Design a protein with these regions (language model features):
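Interfacial segments at transmembrane-helix termini and the short loops linking adjacent helices
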Residues: 106-125, 324, 341-373, 420
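Helix-loop junctions and terminal segments of transmembrane helices
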Residues: 57-72, 290-314
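Interfacial transmembrane-helix starts/ends
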Residues: 3-6, 42, 77-92, 233, ...
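Membrane-interface junctions at transmembrane-helix termini in multi-pass inner-membrane proteins
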Residues: 131-154, 368-398
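Interhelical loop/hinge segments that connect adjacent transmembrane helices in multipass membrane
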Residues: 2, 181-189, 201-245, 317, ...
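Membrane-interface helix-loop junctions in multi-pass transport and translocation proteins
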Residues: 149, 160-202, 206, 390, ...
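N-terminal membrane topogenesis motif
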Residues: 1-22, 77, 81, 223-250, ...
């Protein structure tokens, strides 16, 4: 059901994101890692994530769709054949991409990023691509069998082990080699690969435990229709490629920062300072800005099939209220998060990253993106459900072009000369890109479907946020002279949530 799937995915996303934030807080505050370690690891992770997108992003949905179609007509044998062919095909693709990343690590780190220390992290991450490719197929297979919990549990397990292994490896490295940031970043990368292997092992064992049930279903299979390997692969690609174009472009968009920020900052600062500035943005700021999206991410996974079903039956009335609810939820969460991070950027950073508290200006600028990113998530999911996948793609291309242009223009400018120079310029470029992407998608959505959100509903949310902001500022300033700033911001944020909900 819609509500059940929303809850499962919401809880999973929340757990994964919270553990991820804990992991980032630990790394950033760890002596020897800090902002420089974030720069090294994050630059490597962005190109790794792009390879993952190519190998796996559209695969779960494609496999899920084909498997569910076969099972709907009783063809369990055909459904399992899709799974087997997908494992072999995309396992081979993942293995190839692992080899490419491994062999190109030196060139990418030295020439693309201009962060030579990232080479070891890229090498450590490369084996993970193979395992993630197969894991994506297994998740898709069980999703097609309407078993969402298998994939959700595997994501939680992967994130828990990543954090635990990261802490263990970083502590071992720091005690054996000292605070060598390059080695510590590589240790974090190794932890990522190990956690993906553990996730793969969990899903493999899960599949083995279900193999008897699957075998019995195959014996009683109905309406089996032979399809060749080439035909099956082409069917998967026909579904996965349109779904992957957007995420691939988004991955390229992320790598714009990796390839332009350090290069641009070197115009007016040293290599070391440039890495620290870049690490500050991609390590701390991006983590905080993206975190609220986990409250909203569950909607994107459930809106696509729901809207697609409504389109197929040409009956949108049942889903109108759910679409409106998803967009209002994005506003209800996004607007106060934006305002809260803008008002309390400095105390939030001091609370979470006491050893590396810099970056308040960056957080204030970047926080503007939150509401637009959350709205874009849901709008793009609705458009995909309507079969209008080209529209989010167009928005991404335009947004990416704007981000690249602004990065190239603003990042090389010293922020002492112009406020929106340096990393402030990169943050502003990201905000501009996200606004443009939402506007393009939103304009087209209004042409295809009636959203039904009234202006007075938006005004209510804005007024509630303003009231929350005024009360929270008063509470924070009143208690600041009595208790510590860290305790004060915790108290203020608790009151903020309570006031807003009331």
């Amino acid at each position: 059901s819609f509500t059940k799937n929303i809850l499962i995915l919401l809880v999973t996303h929340m757990i994964v994101k919270i553990i991820g934030v804990v992991n980032k807080i630990y790394l950033t505050n760890r002596e020897g890692f800090g902002d420089e370690g974030n720069a090294i690891y994050s630059s490597a992770f962005q190109i790794y994530a792009l390879f993952l997108t190519i190998c796996s992003i559209g695969i779960p949905n494609a496999v899920s769709k084909l498997v569910s179609e076969r099972l709907a007509i009783g063809d369990s044998k055909g459904a399992h054949k899709v799974f087997k062919i997908a494992v072999i095909a995309f396992g081979a693709l993942g293995f190839t991409c692992s080899i490419i990343l491994f062999t190109c690590a030196h060139n990418i780190s030295h020439n693309w990023f201009q962060i030579p220390e990232a080479e070891l992290s890229l090498v450590a991450l490369s084996p993970s691509i193979f395992f993630v490719s197969i894991t994506a197929v297994v998740r898709g297979y069980f999703n097609g069998r309407e078993n969402i919990s298998a994939g959700a549990n595997s994501q939680t397990i992967e994130q828990i082990f990543r954090t635990v292994i990261t802490i263990i490896l970083i502590e071992v490295i720091s005690r054996s080699t000292g605070t060598d940031t390059r080695i510590m970043a590589a240790g974090a990368a190794i932890a990522t690969t190990m956690s993906e292997i553990i996730c793969f092992t969990y899903l493999f064992k899960y599949y083995k435990s279900a193999s008897r049930e699957i075998a019995n279903e195959m014996k009683n299979s109905l309406n089996y229709k032979y399809r060749g390997i080439r035909k099956t692969i082409s069917d998967i690609l026909a579904v996965s490629i349109p779904m992957s174009i957007g995420p691939i472009l988004a991955g390229i968009n992320k790598n714009i920062d990796s390839m332009t920020i350090v290069r641009g900052l070197k115009n007016f600062m040293t290599d070391s300072s440039a890495k620290l500035e870049y690490g500050m943005l991609v390590g701390k700021i991006d983590t905080l800005v993206v975190f609220p999206l986990s409250f909203n991410a569950a909607f994107t996974s459930t809106l696509i099939p729901m809207v697609a079903a409504a389109k197929a039956s040409n009956n949108f009335a049942p889903v109108q209220r759910k679409i409106k609810f998803s967009l209002l939820t994005a506003l209800l969460i996004g607007i106060p998060c934006t305002v809260g991070m803008m008002l309390f950027a400095k105390p939030i950073l001091e609370l979470l990253f006491p050893n590396q508290p810099d970056g308040a200006n960056l957080l204030q600028i970047s926080a503007i993106s939150i509401t637009f990113m959350m709205l874009s998530q849901n709008v793009n999911a609705i458009l995909q459900g309507l079969g209008k996948t080209i529209i989010p793609t167009i928005g991404l291309i335009v947004g990416m072009a704007i981000k690249l242009a602004l990065n190239l223009i603003l990042v090389p400018i010293n922020p002492n000369v112009f406020f929106l120079g340096g990393t402030n310029g990169a943050a502003f470029a990201t905000v501009s890109s996200n606004i443009v992407m939402f506007v393009i998608s939103g304009m087209f959505l209004k042409k295809f479907i009636k959203v039904g959100i009234q202006k007075r509903q938006i005004i209510k949310i804005v007024l509630a946020t303003v009231m929350m902001a005024i009360c929270t500022i008063f509470i924070y300033n009143s208690f600041l002279c009595i208790i510590s700033s860290k305790l004060c911001i915790i108290l203020a944020l608790v009151f903020a949530v309570a006031i807003y909900l009331v």
